[in-house]
């Protein structure tokens, strides 16, 4: 691991999330947004210096060389989202929102919230275009990975075995579905292991909703039980298995000649 303790980024950003004034602004924004959401008029809003809040959001979005960089970038997006919700017609907030979402590589959010945003600086625009190309989802002109998703996807495509643990909000299921979509072919079967029976329907429905048409075009079947009748046709079709480990074990014992090319646990 590279030592970043002597870098300017480390000096600027380390401990920034503990800044008392930053947390005061953040708490005030949460308070005011709570009043807005529930239409509470008999409690006073807390005073927020919008310019200072914007500066913090912009600074946090550029966090590097610290273990808290992901947290900083997430906080930047929270602050700018709260500011925009409280001041929906403020052009300065709209611009900084675009800059924050661009700096954090949240291009999906950028398309939704500030579709016309463009960096003022030519070099920033060039950097932004390069970054977009890097994060663009295969076969999707206007779809983009988050940077953490891109790192996982690259490992999945390059490594024979890959293990990763991340928060639910990272979108691991989305990355898995993207990987499957790009590898649907006459020669590939996929297996997804889920920890409980209750998750079988949820995961298989997600696969059907997101990939159903493509799976049908390539003669795939989604299989949730080792006793499914269609398995008697053996390799007449391609398969996406969604099963618990126990069901998968019976599947492998009962149908040894149906290969599994990609396994997700």
Segments (PLM) and residue ranges:
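N-terminal helicase ATP-binding lobe
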Residues: 1-265
